[in-house]
């Protein structure tokens, strides 16, 4: 156990999308601090001591209320909510752009699915669990936005990958920043802080052409390592950031400055 943030020990952390690629990194980061982690996801995971799984569709208020009932019945305080769940379309080797992500052909069905998980799900989770925090007059909400919530996608990095970054992802991540600022202002007097991070992409064996191209638009010259955001996330959920709310911290290797 690496206790960089000792005040997070025994704190109760809800992570939506905790079984996703990024969600797993967040889960492990809090677990290593001695926190009690509660994962909300549609994908089942193995439970361990201090890790509890709820099969939850965060786009359904009823599902979220069932989780809240669990906390209330057990008289468990919610210390931190991490809104990490989102749908992301990424280039893969030999990818065939069957879903037609070009704006001219982008389907309403995929648009609604992406916004429902990434934005509506974050709003509903904030509404349900944030209200509980506000009643207790204590809590932290951290939203996961993206560098593409700051700037538009540079479609040139997808050249030769037969892929285009869809409009829905950027809209969701911009919306997350708006949700963050609204929530921070709304519950400030209730001692509920809300911040966001805007990370860049994490290396995960992406398409070779994509990797070659994206390095050209990141001043540091590489994608993030999978655990490189851990300390930033922990900091924003700890007492060390007690005077921060409504902040959006960009951690992108310099991508958004050029």
Model-derived features with residue positions:
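Amphipathic alpha-helical dimer-interface segment in Rossmann-like NAD(P)H-dependent oxidoreductases
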Residues: 108, 113-135, 148-149, 184-185, ...
């Amino acid at each position: 156990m690496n206790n960089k943030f000792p005040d997070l020990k025994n704190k109760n952390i809800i992570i939506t999308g905790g079984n996703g690629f990024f969600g797993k990194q967040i889960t492990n980061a809090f677990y290593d601090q001695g926190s009690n982690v509660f994962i909300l996801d549609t994908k089942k995971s193995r439970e361990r001591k201090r890790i509890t799984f709820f099969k939850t569709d965060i786009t359904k208020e009823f599902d979220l209320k069932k989780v809240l009932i669990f906390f209330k019945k057990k008289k468990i305080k919610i210390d931190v909510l991490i809104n990490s769940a989102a749908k992301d379309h990424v280039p893969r080797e030999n990818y065939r752009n069957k879903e037609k992500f070009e704006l001219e052909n982008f389907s309403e069905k995929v648009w609604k699915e992406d916004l429902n998980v990434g934005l509506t799900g974050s709003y509903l989770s904030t509404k349900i669990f944030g209200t509980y925090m506000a009643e207790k007059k204590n809590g932290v909400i951290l939203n996961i936005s993206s560098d593409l919530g700051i700037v538009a996608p540079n479609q040139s990095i997808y050249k030769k990958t037969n892929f285009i970054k869809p409009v829905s992802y950027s809209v969701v991540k911009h919306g997350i920043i708006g949700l963050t600022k609204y929530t921070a202002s709304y519950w400030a007097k209730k001692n509920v802080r809300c911040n966001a991070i805007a990370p860049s992409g994490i290396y995960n064996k992406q398409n070779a052409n994509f990797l070659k191209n994206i390095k050209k638009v990141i001043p540091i010259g590489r994608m993030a390592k999978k655990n490189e955001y851990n300390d930033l996330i922990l900091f924003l959920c700890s007492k060390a950031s007690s005077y921060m709310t409504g902040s959006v911290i960009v951690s992108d290797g310099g991508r958004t400055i050029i």
